[in-house]
Amino acid sequence: MRAVIPYKKENAKSRLSTVMTREQRETFVEKMLLDVVATLKEGGIRNIDIITTNACDVKKEVKANIIEDDTDLNDCLNKYLSQKEEPILIIMADLPLVKFSHIEDIVAGKADVTIVPGKGGGTNILFIRKPENFRVKYYGSSFESHCMIAAQQNLSIRVYDSFLASTDIDEPQDITELILHGHGIAKDYAEKRFGKKEGKGRVKISPFNEIPMY
């Protein structure tokens, strides 16, 4: 089996622009990618592909096969799937809370397709046992789309429900979850820039100062 990680560095995570500069965000996504790759390897996956619009965006310390493709996310992933005959795990690069035990549980399932839903109807992880005929449809309510695609092909579906695996880091409040529950270098990076602000409501992040830190 193989894992594939779609990855974009340039001007990434624009919804974090209220709390991070562009350079900080680009560094942050690099560290999240490193965490995801490390987790995959810890979970027993050795064959890892990273699909990116610019191969130069992936640092040399990322031990994975780099595929450069500047087409739409769905187009490049569907092309990738059409060329594979082994089980494929598609995992997003902004999931530093995923643990190796999640990966082990996901790939151990017997269903044809295992889906890890993300916030707001998204899809964070897809495990497809027979990828050559499966086509993905990200954006919008992709969780529902992928369930429908699997059902139309008479494929068995497993929904893997996990708070940590479902928490992608897109918005400032997500960084709170990373600081509270994380375990890797992305958490370390966030902790150097934010503290926890507690009150009567939910815990929030609070920048240590307003001067950009690199």
From Swiss-Prot:
Gene3D superfamilies: 6.10.140.50, Spore Coat Polysaccharide Biosynthesis Protein SpsA, Chain A
InterPro entries found in the cross-reference section: CofC, Nucleotide-diphossugar_trans
Function: Guanylyltransferase that catalyzes the activation of (2S)-2-phospholactate (2-PL) as (2S)-lactyl-2-diphospho-5'-guanosine, via the condensation of 2-PL with GTP. It is involved in the biosynthesis of coenzyme F420, a hydride carrier cofactor.
GO terms for biological process, alphabetical: F420-0 metabolic process
Full protein name: 2-phospho-L-lactate guanylyltransferase
EC code(s) of this entry: 2.7.7.68
Subunit structure: Homodimer.
Keywords, sorted A to Z: GTP-binding, Nucleotide-binding, Nucleotidyltransferase, Transferase
Family in the record: Belongs to the CofC family.
Pathway as given in its UniProt record: Cofactor biosynthesis; coenzyme F420 biosynthesis
NCBIfam families in the cross-refs: F420_cofC
SUPFAM superfamilies: Nucleotide-diphospho-sugar transferases
Catalytic reaction annotation: (2S)-2-phospholactate + GTP + H(+) = (2S)-lactyl-2-diphospho-5'-guanosine + diphosphate
GO molecular function: GTP binding; phospholactate guanylyltransferase activity
Domain of life: Archaea
